[in-house]
């Protein structure tokens, strides 16, 4: 019996110039996704995925590291211009937005807050009593 040759397909990376950075800042974590203009995910990162555990995930420093990690992955695909869309009330929100502008070689084109606001929808959780 003849042996089959194993042929690996080469990974073809498309060069994408423009993209959108989605920053989801919750009270417990910060998630960052870089997409192209059509919404296809190119790179992503989160504070928990970088090794931050417990209450350290919700810190501004962890959010900054998550943004830098996601954008460095996206730069391999050729991203040069990004828009920023922020969602959520988390503590890492402001730092994450500032660190997008701090990454070398990436220009910020727009900024938009897409946090959903209820028009008197669900009842919020009761206050913590410690």
From Swiss-Prot:
Keyword annotations from UniProtKB, A to Z: Ribonucleoprotein, Ribosomal protein, RNA-binding, rRNA-binding
InterPro entries hit by this protein: Ribosomal_uS11, Ribosomal_uS11_bac-type, Ribosomal_uS11_CS, Ribosomal_uS11_sf
GO cellular component: ribonucleoprotein complex; ribosome
Keyword Ribosomal protein attached: yes
UniProt GO molecular function: rRNA binding; structural constituent of ribosome
GO biological process: translation
Pfam family for this entry, one: Ribosomal_S11
Assembly and interaction partners: Part of the 30S ribosomal subunit. Interacts with proteins S7 and S18. Binds to IF-3.
Alphabetical list of HAMAP family matching this protein: Ribosomal_uS11 (MF_01310)
Membership in a protein family: Belongs to the universal ribosomal protein uS11 family.
PANTHER family associated with the record: 40S RIBOSOMAL PROTEIN S14/30S RIBOSOMAL PROTEIN S11
Protein name (database record): Small ribosomal subunit protein uS11
Source organism (scientific name): Campylobacter concisus (strain 13826)
């Amino acid at each position: 019996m003849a042996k089959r040759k194993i042929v690996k397909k080469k990974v073809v990376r498309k060069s994408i110039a423009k993209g959108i950075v989605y920053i989801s800042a919750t009270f417990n974590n910060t998630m960052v996704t870089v997409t192209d203009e059509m919404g296809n995910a190119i790179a992503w990162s989160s504070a928990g995925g970088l090794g931050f555990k417990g209450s350290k995930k919700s810190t501004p420093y962890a959010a900054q590291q998550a943004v830098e990690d996601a954008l460095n992955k996206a730069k391999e695909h050729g991203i040069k211009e990004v828009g920023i869309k922020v969602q959520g009330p988390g503590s890492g929100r402001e730092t994450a937005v500032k660190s997008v502008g701090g990454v070398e070689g990436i220009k910020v084109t727009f900024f938009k807050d897409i946090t959903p606001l209820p028009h008197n929808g669900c009842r919020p959780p009761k206050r913590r009593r410690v």
